[in-house]
Regions:
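Subunit-assembly interface segments of extracellular/virion macromolecular structures
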Residues: 1-193
């Protein structure tokens, strides 16, 4: 549709482990149970990089240190054509963490900088705090994680899936609740909840 220019490919948000001990009533969108941690963006716009690389989070380890509650994990940039049985690792960042004060903080190790065009000054502006060490991706860390105000024991556990349309259905006018979208209609279209 050509409404937008090239955009960098990005992963879904990588999310934390469930912080409650019960699976009853589990909802991935419940922020009291699961937190967004970070996601990756390709450095180049368009879909070329998206077809060449994939990202794996490996070596996830909870902290065993009483003085440092932050666990560690590794990030692997892999060839998109490889398999888990025979991985082809292009770049590897070992023992990174989510502690903004650490030298192994994921943003410091991989980098989070990107360019954006500023019409006022008519030039590109560098945004982000840490130069990119990766040749392929930059990381975007969720704001509360970057400020150090989230639970220090959080570790990457999964990711949100792609967006999808909300389900919907038809309801007869005689069955419609009082707050339906239209009144007096014999067929009312409303989202299913």
């Amino acid at each position: 549709d050509f409404k937008y220019g090239f955009q960098a490919a990005q992963t879904p948000w990588i999310i934390s482990q469930d912080r409650q001990n019960s699976s009853a009533g589990y909802d991935i969108l419940d922020t009291s149970r699961v937190s967004k941690l970070f996601k990756f963006h390709t450095l180049d716009a368009g879909d070329d990089e998206m077809k060449k690389i994939k990202i794996s989070i490996t070596d996830i380890k909870a902290s065993t240190n009483d003085f440092d509650p932050y666990g560690t994990f590794s990030v692997e940039i892999r060839d998109a054509r490889d398999s888990d049985n025979s991985p082809i690792v292009i770049e590897r960042y070992s023992s990174v963490n989510l502690n903004p004060n650490s030298t192994q903080y994921i943003s410091k190790v991989i980098g989070d900088q990107f360019l954006t065009w500023d019409d006022t000054v008519r030039r590109y502006i560098v945004k982000g705090n840490y130069p990119n060490a990766s040749n392929y991706v930059r990381v975007e860390v969720e704001r509360d994680v970057d400020r150090g105000v989230t639970d220090a024991t959080l570790l990457p556990f999964g990711s949100y899936g792609p967006l999808r349309f909300q389900q919907w259905g038809y309801q007869s006018g005689s069955d419609a609740p009082a707050n339906a979208w239209a009144r007096g209609s014999t067929n009312i279209c409303r989202p299913l909840i």
